[in-house]
Amino acid sequence: MELLCCEVDPVRRAVPDRNLLEDRVLQNLLTIEERYLPQCSYFKCVQKDIQPYMRRMVATWMLEVCEEQKCEEEVFPLAMNYLDRFLAGVPTPKTHLQLLGAVCMFLASKLKETIPLTAEKLCIYTDNSVKPQELLEWELVVLGKLKWNLAAVTPHDFIEHILRKLPQQKEKLSLIRKHAQTFIALCATDFKFAMYPPSMIATGSVGAAICGLQQDDEVNTLTCDALTELLAKITHTDVDCLKACQEQIEALLLNSLQQFRQEQHNAGSKSVEDPDQATTPTDVRDVDL
């Protein structure tokens, strides 16, 4: 008799606690969220060696690592929060940027994952340009500069608070959530969103997700303007600011899709058997505008 071990243990999750979705929790998140934002636009006043395109490159690499390791959705935005806060206070040579990104993923996965990423695995993703001991030493450096304040508020903390207040059918919420999570990951790769309050990014992402799905009449129960006003009311956000944020998110998605299609076109001669490389955030190709 042949025995096959095909069982895959599902991720064990706690039962949703309604107490964590009460208005007082949302208000507390709104009160403290700006404590964890970068204090300045560090490319102008702190970093002399690192340019915005370098941040975008390391962010894309970090996102691909998180996707391949099937990390929780919160890990990547949280890691980018650590990276931006560190760079806002510490001049860093560009040769250490990938090391910093690996350390930030290491810390974020410890906070959000049941089984966190290991130092050895992260070093493999750097093509062994970083050694495990070096990563562990830098872990202490980053922790010290962040003053051990790791429980940062991210856009994901607001998603469930927002969704439960929307007049949407429950069976549609999972699709809206999935698209909103994609937008949040996309925003984390672009520095212009680094100093936006997480609540605004979350609200804009949900709004962009629903408006992008408006071809489905069952999803679109409100006009986009009415939806924006409702979302702004939920998170106490200025309507005009929210509209501007949502437009920037949609423009970022469009640019990402165009870039992906261009890369596909350039790789037209590539063998069909070659694996598809992650060049765009999770499920971006499935999002409609």
Swiss-Prot record:
Residues modified as Phosphothreonine: T280
Compartments where located: Nucleus; Cytoplasm; Nucleus membrane
Domain Cyclin N-terminal: 26-151
SMART domains listed in its UniProt record: CYCLIN (SM00385), Cyclin_C (SM01332)
GO CC field: chromatin; cyclin D2-CDK4 complex; cytosol; nuclear membrane; nucleolus; nucleoplasm; nucleus
PTM comment: Phosphorylation at Thr-280 by MAP kinases is required for ubiquitination and degradation by the DCX(AMBRA1) complex.
MF terms in GO: cyclin-dependent protein serine/threonine kinase activator activity; protein kinase binding
Domain of life of the native organism: Eukaryota
Keywords noted in UniProt: Cell cycle, Cell division, Cyclin, Cytoplasm, Membrane, Nucleus, Phosphoprotein, Ubl conjugation
Modified residues annotated as Phosphoserine in this record: S271
Start and end residues of each stretch annotated as Disordered: 264-289
Main location (coarse class): nucleus
Gene Ontology biological process terms, A to Z: adult locomotory behavior; cell division; cellular response to X-ray; G1/S transition of mitotic cell cycle; long-term memory; negative regulation of apoptotic process; positive regulation of cell population proliferation; positive regulation of G1/S transition of mitotic cell cycle
Pfam assignment, any one: Cyclin_N
Coiled coil: none
InterPro entries: Cyclin, Cyclin-like_dom, Cyclin-like_sf, Cyclin_C-dom, Cyclin_N, Cyclins_cyclin-box
Gene3D superfamilies reported for this sequence: Cyclin-like
Role noted for this protein: Regulatory component of the cyclin D2-CDK4 (DC) complex that phosphorylates and inhibits members of the retinoblastoma (RB) protein family including RB1 and regulates the cell-cycle during G(1)/S transition. Phosphorylation of RB1 allows dissociation of the transcription factor E2F from the RB/E2F complex and the subsequent transcription of E2F target genes which are responsible for the progression through the G(1) phase. Hypophosphorylates RB1 in early G(1) phase. Cyclin D-CDK4 complexes are major integrators of various mitogenenic and antimitogenic signals.
PANTHER family: CYCLINS
Quaternary structure (record): Interacts with either CDK4 or CDK6 protein kinase to form a serine/threonine kinase holoenzyme complex. The cyclin subunit imparts substrate specificity to the complex.
Family: Belongs to the cyclin family. Cyclin D subfamily.
This protein's name: G1/S-specific cyclin-D2
Protein source organism: Mus musculus (Mouse)
Protein's gene: Ccnd2
